[in-house]
């Protein structure tokens, strides 16, 4: 088991506050999350905004710039999921996101997540220094095979029911990290800990941190 299990706040802390909002991200940061996870979409006028839905409703979706302003609150990592729902190549979207990362000089504090491995391949091409995380939710493939397909991503983020100790050990042997999603029940946290994962993505980072502290893992 890693010496420190990293806590990733899913969409901030959606068990406590409205997801993908500045308030949820601030809450997760203040409670001690190591990373805040968020979904990114591209608007028709070229704005990168934080939203789970590809079609935006009128509402207070924060811009990526707004969320990057929170960087001064700590040394946490930004888990940026680039959501792409088109057969077209995502080059433009990736370039917009990378431009913002460079503008804010946050290359060392972001990890790019995606289910669409084209996104990860483009990011790897233009910014090889930025960490990549391959999201996966189906299949029995070894995590190192998933990472290889995903532009040699450094981290694999599987749906947590896919996690086994054997898969995690094989991933670690290949110098990969495993960070499952979205894990919210204490019994499932314990199962992930027993499997040896490196971090956990959860809707309730405060509760997970308390759970880890009670077990001397924080």
Language model features: what each stretch is:
Residues 1-218:
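Phosphate-group recognition and catalysis centered on beta-loop-alpha active-site segments
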């Amino acid at each position: 088991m890693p010496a420190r299990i990293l806590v990733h706040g899913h969409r901030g802390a959606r068990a406590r506050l409205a997801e993908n909002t500045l308030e949820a991200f601030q809450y997760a940061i203040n409670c001690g999350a190591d990373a805040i996870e968020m979904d990114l979409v591209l608007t028709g006028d070229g704005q990168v905004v934080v939203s789970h839905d590809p079609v935006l409703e009128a509402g207070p979706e924060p811009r990526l710039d707004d969320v990057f302003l929170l960087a001064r609150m700590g040394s946490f990592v930004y888990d940026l999921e680039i959501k792409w729902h088109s057969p077209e190549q995502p080059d433009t979207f990736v370039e917009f996101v990378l431009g913002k990362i460079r503008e804010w000089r946050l290359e060392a504090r972001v990890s790019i997540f995606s289910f669409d491995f084209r996104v990860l391949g483009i990011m790897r091409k233009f910014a090889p220094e930025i960490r990549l995380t391959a999201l996966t939710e189906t299949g029995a493939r070894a995590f190192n095979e998933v990472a290889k397909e995903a532009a040699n991503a450094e981290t694999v983020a599987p749906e947590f029911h896919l996690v086994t100790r054997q898969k995690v050990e094989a991933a670690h042997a290949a110098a990969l990290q495993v960070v499952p999603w979205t894990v919210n029940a204490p019994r499932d946290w314990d199962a992930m800990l027993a499997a040896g994962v490196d971090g956990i993505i959860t809707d309730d980072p405060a509760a997970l941190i308390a759970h880890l502290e009670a077990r001397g893992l924080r």
